[in-house]
Amino acid sequence: MNILQNLKKSDPIISNLINSEKNRQETHLELIASENFASMAVMQAQGSVLTNKYAEGLPQKRYYGGCEFVDEIEELAIERAKQLFDADWANVQPHSGAQANAAVFLSLLNPGDTILGMDLSHGGHLTHGSPVNMSGKWFNAVHYGVDKETNKLNFNVIRDIALATKPKLIICGYSAYPRTIDFKSFRSIADEVGAFLMADIAHIAGLVASKLHPNPIPYCDVVTTTTHKTLRGPRGGLILCKDKEFGKKFDKSVFPGTQGGPLEHIIAAKAVAFGEALQPNFVNYSKQVIKNAKVLSSTLINRGIDIVSGGTDNHIVLLDLRSINMTGKVADLLVSEVNITANKNTVPFDPESPFVTSGLRLGTAALTTRGFNDEAFIEVGEIIADRLLNPDDLLIEKECKERVLSLCNSFPLYEAKLESSIK
């Protein structure tokens, strides 16, 4: 059964658009920090007949018949997730990281309770109490940021805020923080004020799984994550904790609390991705992700472009473009013109609006999946610097695009293994 050939026959418009997106991915340098390239096996699992199956409830406790095989699949996904993160309990049903966070909030909080998370403009996430998100509308959200001098977490300041506001839940884990998170210090603050502690490790899950970043499981009451980004699986969510009885609360908050039927085709793809991440070569991949980020950061610094916090400990490199008198909006456009995909991003204490910003966020997970190494990332950094430092030079723009295409040809995506219908 050739699903892609069937698609080409039944809906050539969608087939052609998928083909266009595949070609875009092949010919661009993907540096969006929240993106990665799933394996063929992951994509095949999520494109399988499992999409036909409804399975409300948990394995062995379904509200529908015919679930014997999806039960086995989901149980395998749960066990692999637990093994991967040294957890005692896992729920693999959340459709996204945001859904996972919502389920945790439903379990632990009542409307009006105080939550303490990082300010979005300092590297937090919408679901950590932003006023435009449900988390900021239903709860009394207060925020901490980074130190103005170091752009790193200052636990003395965070402790003072927690003591003054007495949050019921403290959230750590970020979308644009390039440094190691000290979960033990957060645990100490949470204990002092009597708060629950939640870690959202969506960006660093793959590094945690590879034991290249501290594991939050021993310190946090609950851990949420996405399953893509550095974990390199399908788009989806995951909840983990060390207390099985506590975990039962989250089970009920996922279903029936915030979701109906689980997406068993995505859960199968999660199981495949977790299995891949349990292999020794995934640790090597994660090591290269961090190494590449450090190389990219140092290359840009050497060209006179400031990096928030002076470097990185993970996959994120956050450029502070005030050092070259440029906005994130302009930089995003400039690199896109030479086939580099990134995103404008606020930096701590940013004078610009979120629609303009002073930063550009880069990530190394996707290109590392393509096989990019230290040498390749030096070239990536040089191309970015050449483009940003010479925004009006059309010759340099042309040369930068040619260099990008040369890199793409040197590190092909999927190595032409996709079906011919989308080649």
Curated annotation (Swiss-Prot):
GO MF annotations in UniProt: glycine hydroxymethyltransferase activity; pyridoxal phosphate binding
Biological processes, Gene Ontology terms: glycine biosynthetic process from serine; tetrahydrofolate interconversion
Coiled coil (residue ranges): none
Superkingdom to which the source organism belongs: Bacteria
Annotated pathway: One-carbon metabolism; tetrahydrofolate interconversion; Amino-acid biosynthesis; glycine biosynthesis; glycine from L-serine: step 1/1
EC number: 2.1.2.1
Localization: Cytoplasm
Keywords, alphabetical: Amino-acid biosynthesis, Cytoplasm, One-carbon metabolism, Pyridoxal phosphate, Transferase
Function recorded in the entry: Catalyzes the reversible interconversion of serine and glycine with tetrahydrofolate (THF) serving as the one-carbon carrier. This reaction serves as the major source of one-carbon groups required for the biosynthesis of purines, thymidylate, methionine, and other important biomolecules. Also exhibits THF-independent aldolase activity toward beta-hydroxyamino acids, producing glycine and aldehydes, via a retro-aldol mechanism.
Similarity comment: family membership: Belongs to the SHMT family.
Name the UniProt record assigns to this protein: Serine hydroxymethyltransferase
Species annotation: Prochlorococcus marinus (strain MIT 9515)
